[in-house]
Amino acid sequence: MSVSRNPRVAAATLALAVAALGAATVGGAAPSTATTTNATTRTLTGPVTTTAAAASRPTRAAARRTLPGGYRHLVVIYQENHSFDNLYGRWGRVHGRRVRGLGQATRAQQTQVAQDGTPYVCLPQNDVNLTSPPLTPTCTTDPHLTEPSHFTNRPFLIDNFIKPEDKTCPPPGVSAPFGVPKNSTGALSGGCTRDLVHRFYQEQYQLDGGRQDRYTTGSDAVGLTQGVYRTRRLPIYSYLHRRSAPKYVVADNFFQAAFGGSFLNHQWLIAARTPIGNGVPDATQPTNSVLDANGMPNSYPQYKAGPPVDPNETTVRDGQLTRKCAATALPLDIQYIDACGNWAVNTVQPESPPFSSSGSRIALIDDDTYPNIGDRLTAAGISWNWYSGGWDDAESGHAGPQFQYHHQPFNYFADYAPGTPGREHLKDERRFIAAANRGQLPTVSFVKPYGAENEHPGYASEPDGSDHLVNLLKTVTTGPQARKTLVVVTYDEFGGQWDHVSPPPVDKWGPGTRIPALVISKSFRHSAVDHRFYDTTSILSTIERSYGLEPLSTRDARSHSLAHAVALANR
């Protein structure tokens, strides 16, 4: 809804503009409650100053501006937890150009090493469907393993062992840490695997300074990290290669904005920064992580944590916050793990409902000090919404068992708390489908599928989630606004899964592992491959540059927009 049509949003716009007069910094500079000894904070995250006059300028020009290629609507579909190689590594060629996938990975890039730095001979496994019924041992001479394995030290096809139709998925709300035994009582079809750890410090250890060789050692799921899917059998691939399908661009150099998991990368999707983890009174308080000399906060089947580097601590701890800025420095070989203070990097719950009754909660983020892209769009009079599967049920107090509270990033901000005008921008996915069918999409739509449909390993089926993605795309590309709409499909983060391409170092937050990304439109002339470097904040950059909005931090200010991808498809 634009400011000119909705008096409540208009009031919020005026309030934001007035408040901006007193805001010193936005987009990532640390407030006094965050402790940091790293001077790069100031250069990496701001400040970016805003005035009321600057905030009002885009409002007058918004109606005359469009997205790259003249598109008038942007739809961002944000899926869950897969690396590029894991899903798209076997894509092949597009319009004669090669997608950078598994075929370009060298043997060294595929090889995983143990904690002592020597290569595994075999890949250890603990997903129940990769260990039983007993698979014929083909690898028995690895000194790092206590049991023989069927898997040698290289990527393997998950589909060869867990097929899309196999009953290996848990019932909704049921935890299965090591996976669901195939055809066991209560098991559902869908070819689910177990979940894999995907956290801030663990990913940095797994990346190993760009060598990409510690994914197995730094994971609770060990060798499953090397599993990949048959790309050309995925529903999304099949759909995009039908005669009637829209054309697409594969962005094969697109990385998650920040190291770690879903909570943090959802924050970077909308705000291009890491939030401060100030706790909420009368709730479980978030804790700082405590690291060993390798930068790891805990042990795993193939990793034994050492004593903490901080002499004031007695044991390592995998907390919700970054490590404390202690006087004792980390070893020189892991200086890249330099984020410290009270930054919330692992999953925490919001102060505003809906939230989980378990887990730490953090105070609402002040939009006047740290605005997000919703604030920018509202101030400019540009219509937008965040659509989430299961939102209406969750907001009424009856959240589905697979509704993920930490996938709702705007709910962590004060201006979107219950009863505020901003709350009107948070809607159920069903309303997105209805709007697309009626030709009433806002200028910018973020779409977050419900847990059972978001492709997340452990609790969701990859093929079922891909089917849901296809249905969303069909809704957009057959609707009245199809030819004026640009769709971006990407994933929040890697889900703990290996990829062979090293992330280019940018700052202390990331980027992390390479993730799948597609740019799609019904009016594209042909499909293409884009090798340009992008990360999650490129979505923000696309919006900001299209509508003349102030960047939220120096990361999105520097990021490439997706204009190049659009140009490739329309040549």
Whereabouts are the PLM-identified features?
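N-terminal pro-sequences and low-complexity stem/linker regions of secreted or lumenal proteins
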Residues: 34, 39-571
